[in-house]
Amino acid sequence: SRPDIIYGETALVDLNRNFIGMRRLKAPEQLSRKSFRMGMLVCHQAFIAKRSIAPNYDLAYRFSSDFDWCIKCMRSAQTLFNTHQILINYLNEGATTKNRKASLQERYNIMVKYYGKTTVKILHIWFAIRFLFAKIFKKNA
């Protein structure tokens, strides 16, 4: 049978559609409904769900309805398939990038909704530590 969701990689492009590089977050080999605890590991444009499991976007979220939608789809899916292919060329600057703080707050709230406040707080402490180490090592490199 066909998978409920197929997903793949994302290439970043500039306004002239010139290749910049690959998205920092790589699509995991095995994607599951718990995967997005670590952030949006797959761009929604590189995430294709069967219509039968795909709900409407929750328009209460201005910047992160895609994040909520992907989690809802994964919660309904039985099979997810990694294509190991670049599925989209993604414009590096978009509405979410321009509204980063509001987008991050929405994503945090969505994560709490699906994964629980304690889990999300612990994960965000880990994200902060990882970010600081990356910054320190980048300076020293």
Model-derived segments and spans:
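Conserved nucleotide-sugar donor-binding catalytic segment
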Residues: 8, 14, 21-102, 106
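Short, solvent-exposed polar/charged micro-motifs at secondary-structure junctions
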Residues: 14-18, 92, 129-135
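Conserved donor-nucleotide/metal-binding helix-loop-beta segment in metal-dependent transferases, i.e.
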Residues: 1-5
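Membrane-proximal basic amphipathic "stem/tether" segments
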Residues: 112-141
